[in-house]
Amino acid sequence: MNFETVIGLEVHVELNTNSKIFSPTSAHFGNDQNANTNVIDWSFPGVLPVLNKGVVDAGIKAALALNMDIHKKMHFDRKNYFYPDNPKAYQISQFDEPIGYNGWIEVKLEDGTTKKIGIERAHLEEDAGKNTHGTDGYSYVDLNRQGVPLIEIVSEADMRSPEEAYAYLTALKEVIQYAGISDVKMEEGSMRVDANISLRPYGQEKFGTKTELKNLNSFSNVRKGLEYEIQRQAEILRSGGQIRQETRRYDEANKTTILMRVKEGAADYRYFPEPDLPLFEISDEWIEEMRTELPEFPKERRARYVSDLGLSDYDANQLTANKVTSDFFEKAVALGGDAKQVSNWLQGEVAQFLNAEGKTLEQIELTPENLVEMITIIEDGTISSKIAKKVFVHLAKNGGGAREYVEKAGMVQISDPAILIPIIHQVFADNEAAVADFKSGKRNADKAFTGFLMKATKGQANPQVALKLLAQELAKLKEN
């Protein structure tokens, strides 16, 4: 029997506000344990939460970017549960009236087709703290993350393969990043994914029993975890067994899923309206203000890069996959850089350098200004493409002006015949055996002189000019 796969994804995204959702404490990642905390995060008696307006701004932008309807009458709810990293014993979230609902996003699949994936809801909530288990037998609680603002985006169960789930996450990450509401860095926990997956016989409308997958710390692991789970569930069903409603985690080392707990029924969190936060309304004016702050999104940028700048679909997709790269490209072209040349550098030498150094574009000293200047001095013959690679590495590590560095480092390309011809004559004098081979008509003997000349000029000879002059002087040599 063959089965149809049904997948839905729950994505938690940390919003990039300066402070937390209900307290003035910094929401920045990477500080010492419990450095970003105060009495609200610790849940001291008598303290009251105050809603951060910037969080609602971000929620409105997310809803608009994901084509969602917006609940204008807003309130928060208490989700009651006990865990050491949750000192209040409840989480402030949104239950029956999320900020956004009934949305969709269009994704591009591997075969080039597109599919619209429904988004059931997007709700605002606070993050919990973090438990760490020490080798000394103690467990420690870090509340830096407690109260960091989240938006949870819940898709419809519209995906039918791990590939579609991967495409959905890629598109969602792009939209959220372009909207400017999160850096969506999975390695820092600012984007976290849970997957719900079930199988059903083809033609059956009723969903099968679902399994929830956790510990999916990369898009690649989402795909691998789903692929394994499809295989596991299919084997159980084909052998006459039944799927239990479980929560499982993906084991990256063994590429399997491991049981965490069995769900006997839906968890009862005893939701009720948050009494410490007043109701409020999102006005049409507020929504329109947020709409005007939204940028051009990847789909529109890709189309413009192809139609206006003459880039290929591939180049347009590569450049817009990351907003930082795309914004860098935009500025470089606005400064007069040739679109294709800028694209080639960003996808070639720049990407290789970033991979080798383990850095992002924001973490190096290359700027649109000095990249465009470097491309300009390649085009005007000041430096060769070979020398440009060395210049680029210097700019990436140290910044500064490309032309200034080239001149100070003595890298300016030699194009003057008055300088090159004497060097060519010296090459002949220094390589008598090669001259004899050439005069005797030995095959390809002339090729050696190209290398001799480039070595003599330390690679600074303009290749086009040098080859023309070399051919001219070799012809004279043969006549003598």
Swiss-Prot record:
GO terms for molecular function: asparaginyl-tRNA synthase (glutamine-hydrolyzing) activity; ATP binding; glutaminyl-tRNA synthase (glutamine-hydrolyzing) activity. It catalyses: L-glutamyl-tRNA(Gln) + L-glutamine + ATP + H2O = L-glutaminyl-tRNA(Gln) + L-glutamate + ADP + phosphate + H(+); L-aspartyl-tRNA(Asn) + L-glutamine + ATP + H2O = L-asparaginyl-tRNA(Asn) + L-glutamate + ADP + phosphate + 2 H(+). Its EC number is 6.3.5.-. The keyword Protein biosynthesis applies. The keyword Thylakoid does not apply. Signal peptide: none annotated. Keywords: ATP-binding, Ligase, Nucleotide-binding, Protein biosynthesis. One of its GO terms (biological process) is glutaminyl-tRNAGln biosynthesis via transamidation. InterPro entries: Asn/Gln-tRNA_amidoTrfase_suB/E (IPR017959), Asn/Gln-tRNA_Trfase_suB/E_cat (IPR006075), Asn/Gln_amidotransferase (IPR018027), Asn/Gln_tRNA_amidoTrase-B-like (IPR003789), GatB (IPR004413), GatB_C_1 (IPR042114), GatB_Yqey_C_2 (IPR023168), Gln-tRNA_amidoTrfase_suB_CS (IPR017958). Heterotrimer of A, B and C subunits. Allows the formation of correctly charged Asn-tRNA(Asn) or Gln-tRNA(Gln) through the transamidation of misacylated Asp-tRNA(Asn) or Glu-tRNA(Gln) in organisms which lack either or both of asparaginyl-tRNA or glutaminyl-tRNA synthetases. The reaction takes place in the presence of glutamine and ATP through an activated phospho-Asp-tRNA(Asn) or phospho-Glu-tRNA(Gln). NCBIfam families: gatB, PRK05477.1-1, PRK05477.1-2, PRK05477.1-4. Belongs to the GatB/GatE family. GatB subfamily. This is Aspartyl/glutamyl-tRNA(Asn/Gln) amidotransferase subunit B.
